[in-house]
């Protein structure tokens, strides 16, 4: 009996009225046979003293794993009867709520698991409960928007909720808390949400970082009149890189598919896209050229195949150099000087840059970017991928808020002294 007493401590069952009678090891799980019994209380209806009647049919209560096996408690609860008014009552315990079968410790574990990126089906499988139980616990979470404040620095972006449909997300740049997740990214949806904030609150926003999605520009200016728009530097470089890539493909396709030039440009395309300062000087045998060459020597050979390729490559590298050194005057001076001399693919990018000049200058002068929100989007994609997608947007939204806005305390490890 003393061993069974220690088992109640091990299982963190603090109710002294629960007595463990036996433990049965099944093939797939453990069963803990227990009973709940205490002295008869007064009748809640008439006030007379009730008497012990019999035991209820065992309640099958799922519990946390023990020794790596699923565990459930078969708890027989005492019933009481009032012989004055015939009132029947079942014994109660803090282990589970009245009229419930899921113990509090399992509900706590569900909440803890929801903070992680695990899918709800996996949580249900790990805890030996139904997915519906996990969803009910998810619906217990309530997140209220605080319309009395906004951070001074915000990040805007979008992510894919369903195929072909993008959703909007806004994040506090410094604290990394999610401000809102909206089902669509149209101007009407975003405007209607942020207009819930008073104009005085919106005027306190100083910086908004975003990617190069032009419909956001005018909307941000109207909603946040004092905010500077900072474009994400990654997307600016990406525009130049894509223009260079398309230019390379067009020039490559001018050669015959079986020619040496076509095969060389196709095989070593990364050298053209790569920043020239990062080219390796190590010499290796290159089967395409049948000689030992460095990456820089290969690049020189590729550029010798086309004057257009060489001209646009050097221009591309010079733009990257000025951009990474954060020299907006030289960067835009080079664009303006070459606007009419470059291929239409580059002209399109240059015109976009000139149109968004103020926002790109902000990106070069201010130490803000969308990198933190892009990292958040990767976590959102992970939640979605683990769950094989979501049908219900509200459930998806709650998972995002739980995973990203609720901070999980880290265990502080204490090293033992030798």
Task: Annotate each predicted stretch with a short phrase.
Residues 1-87, 91-93:
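Short, conserved DNA-binding cores of transcription-related domains
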Residues 236-257:
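Short alpha-helix plus adjacent loop in nuclease-associated cores
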Residues 47, 60-165, 202-205, 209, ...:
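Short, positively charged, Gly/Tyr-enriched micro-motifs
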Residues 48-51, 87-90, 115, 119, ...:
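Non-catalytic alpha-helical coupling and interface elements of nucleotide-dependent molecular machines
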Residues 93, 171-177:
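Gly-rich Lys/Arg/Thr-decorated short loops/hinges at beta-loop-alpha junctions or inter-strand turns
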Residues 99-110, 121, 180, 324, ...:
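Acidic, glycine-enriched active-site microenvironments
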Residues 40, 45, 51, 138, ...:
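Acidic/histidine-rich catalytic cores and adjacent linkers
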Residues 99-101, 179-201, 207:
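Active-site beta-loop-alpha junctions of metal-dependent nucleic acid enzymes
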